[in-house]
Amino acid sequence: MPRLPDSGRGGDKTVPPTDVTSDSQTVAERFRAAWTGPADKSTAIPELLPVRLARACVQVLPVSGAGLSLLDHDFRVPVGSSDDMATHAERLQFTQGEGPCLDAAREHQVIVAAADEIERRWPAFGAEFLKHTPYRGVVSLPVRLSGNTVGALDLFLENEQDLGRLSIADGITVTQQITDALAVAHAITKSATAWSDEPEPLWLQSSSARNRTNVWVAMGMLMTRMDVPAADALSVLRAYSYGHDAVLDDVADELVKGTLDVAEVQR
């Protein structure tokens, strides 16, 4: 079975998501058993299907954390993570506007990086990521549906040497299993809805996804106040977050709640 090379410190590999072998069938079975097994009450509702899928990644693969982000009308939305630390890692990527998840989705490639490469390739994100999380390696895989990239799966490792233990085939097989699970769940939702309606995927109603929508609301507030386009409003939010050592999602939440004044952010 092909495996990700042991990158060591400073190693980075970009791999086309096509290397799948028959040996991965066992991984597929284990993954299905992990996410379809008895869920704890906190993740039993349909909205938290991506959380169950992310936790199953950690059970089946030699990784420390996992996070799943999907695209919604050109916006990247976090829909599920294995734990709070994996959630924070995704939020750091979004705050800095760079990182492996973004590159995997943009380049339609599997991204593999150890600590030194994380710092080199994404300096702003890398500095915060290595400072505020225990992770020292990351593998990001594009999530594809009907030939289109619809998001990315981040796999985080506390020991960068474990990058050499993670099979490309296993990672891609798990990603395909995630895509299938989400597609089936959404099809079931659609079948229960009037034919003229296009229901929103239930996982976009999760708390992590709803929290991200506050960023778009905050952007709208800045666009109106400053008379700037959306990209500039997002840049202002990122600059304020960086200058105050804060996560962009938290800054947006404070703006929407009114505990932070727009004038303070635009200075």
Roles of regions detected by a PLM:
Residues I168-D180:
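Allosteric cytosolic regulatory segments
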Residues A152-D162, L166, L182-V184:
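Short beta-strand-to-loop transition segments that serve as allosteric relay/switch motifs
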Residues R136-R144:
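A short, aliphatic-rich beta-strand micro-motif
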Residues G67-L71, V77-V79, A86-P123, A127-R136:
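Regulatory sensory and allosteric helical modules in signal-transduction proteins
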Residues A187-R267:
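Signal-transducing coiled-coil/dimerization helices and immediately adjacent hinge/linker segments
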Residues M1-T95, V236, D253-R267:
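Intrinsically disordered, low-complexity terminal regulatory regions
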Residues V143-L153, I178:
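Short hydrophobic/glycine-rich mini-motifs in sensory/regulatory modules
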Residues V27-E47, V110, P201-S208, V217-M223:
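Short regulatory/linker helices and ligand/cofactor-binding micro-motifs at input modules
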